[in-house]
Amino acid sequence: AAAGRRGGGRVSTKRAGGFTFNHGAQFLTARAPAFVSAAETAIVHAALARWHVAGRDALAGQPTMRDFPDFLQQGLAVRQQTEIATIRHDSDSICLVDKTDETVSARQVIVTAPAPQAARLLQTAAPDLAALAATASYAPCWTAMYGFDAAPPAHNPAPIGDPDGPVGWALWESDRPGGDPSNHALTVQAAPGWSIEHLEDDAADVARTLLLAWQDASGQSVGTPALTSAHRWRYARVV
């Protein structure tokens, strides 16, 4: 079950106004053997592509980040927009109760929510695990998205970012592996410190500020976006 409209959580893609933005995780890395195997299978099926970026060997969803979780959940019965309220033991099974009080029983449960949310879900069924999850600290991330009618100016296709500045990551979507050159979309993710400082700011103010910061950091000058949006990831990364 997933509370969102699509699977993948922070491995996410947004489409709006004819533009496509990979506004969550920008790439994946595979180290654990089981995940390496899954990633290799996804590469064979064109759901992932190798991407050497930001000094690391990474993986990019194809054609978007969201397509990788879509690939993984093929053949599964997935319930979207279903928020689990409680997890509890019931004789020899585990019960999941959603916000409408509908109950589903299972032999095993995997919780992939961010640790603060997982801690609340596991308080009854696995208090020790809940206590461990509660010790995790997360940094938020403001993500701003801009769609333009015109193609971007000439630029270095590498992402830009400064962990100590407002802009932690910024990239034209067309510069991603397999990126559509007609998708004149820019994604800017704020650095953790800036996101913490401005966590409760108005989304429109965040978008305006980050566009100016990106222009200063990149040296690129762009006109008024045809589309502007911002998304706040409250639990973006473990710190």
Q: What are the residue ranges of the model-derived segments?
A:
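Glycine-rich FAD pyrophosphate-binding loop
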Residues: 1-17
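A short alpha-helix-loop-beta-strand transition element characteristic
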Residues: 18-22, 34-58, 81, 130, ...
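A conserved short coil-to-beta-strand element within the FAD-binding core of flavoproteins
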Residues: 80-95
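Glycine-centered tight beta-turn/hairpin loop motif at sheet-sheet or coil-to-beta transitions
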Residues: 99-101
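Active-site substrate-recognition segment that forms the wall
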Residues: 145-199, 205-218
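Flavin (FAD/FMN) cofactor-binding core of flavoprotein oxidoreductases
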Residues: 215-239
